[in-house]
Amino acid sequence: MTKYAFFKGQIVPIEQAKISIMNHAFNYGTGCFEGIRAYWNEREEQLYVFQMAPHYERLLRSCRLLMISLPYSVEKLSELTVELLRREGFREDAYVRPIAYKASELIGVRLHDLQDDFAMFAVPFGKYIEKEEGADAAVSSWRRVDDNAVPARGKITGSYVNAAFSKTEAVLNGFDEAIVLTQDGHVSEGSAENLFLVRDGRLITPPVTENILEGITRAMIIQLAREELGLVVEERPIDRTELYVADEAFFCGTGVQVAAIAHIDRRPVGSGRLGPIVKKIRDLYFAVVRGQVPKYKALCTPVYPK
């Protein structure tokens, strides 16, 4: 249960963290956000925030796109996050949601001459996709919004309506998740997750120029695949039909973590079950994020003093 929020420059009870119905971001989607995972390590009795600095670096880049000016550095944002999590006292996996937004209370679509603000809360959070052996995905009829319309490299609140359209279409049609194409028909990503394929032992993922989020988990997977598993990783455009001939496939992201894809458009991906390469990647990733791999321990920020 969430008890606190960072709001208007201080940590307050969650009930006090309220915005006006006239709030600009509430009316026009003029905000940006991050999702940051914190992982409970039972053996060490420690909560580790994973890759906090890269998330806040990306948040500040999103702020630049929306002309939002925050009075906080990456270091200060990280300190506030640890303080909030300590106050919450979580002894389980958690998810932190920082939001930067246009806080003026007025009517009028624009980014300039508006007040900016920042808020943050955290919630206990488990798996985003529950199926251990793999999700059932469908190629969506909704296309990813192009960079020169609403840039996907920014986590902009209003742009996630595009993700919501594809996700809900998939679920209403009996699937777990959507795969979205670009305007020219190449594979972009999931509704709100990056995507990888495995073909002939090679890991393949769309480049960041295919209107995808510049995923922090995506970059971590690429590093682990190359340096720890010795895999060849190709960042290149992916045709739709490659989805149907892939040996394995998976979604990745802070929320979804690493989630295998068992079927696409009701066609089995490989054996239709969790494949060996995805399993290796997933197992290694979860060991890293819980602070169990010494080489990557510096990416994990402890919450509780020892």
How should these model regions be labeled?
Residues 93-100:
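ATP-grasp fold ATP-binding core
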Residues 1-83, 106-306:
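Helix-start/capping segments and mature chain N-termini
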Residues 86-90:
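Non-catalytic accessory segments adjacent to catalytic cores
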Residues 103:
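Active-site loop/lid in soluble adenylation, ligation, and acyl-transfer enzymes
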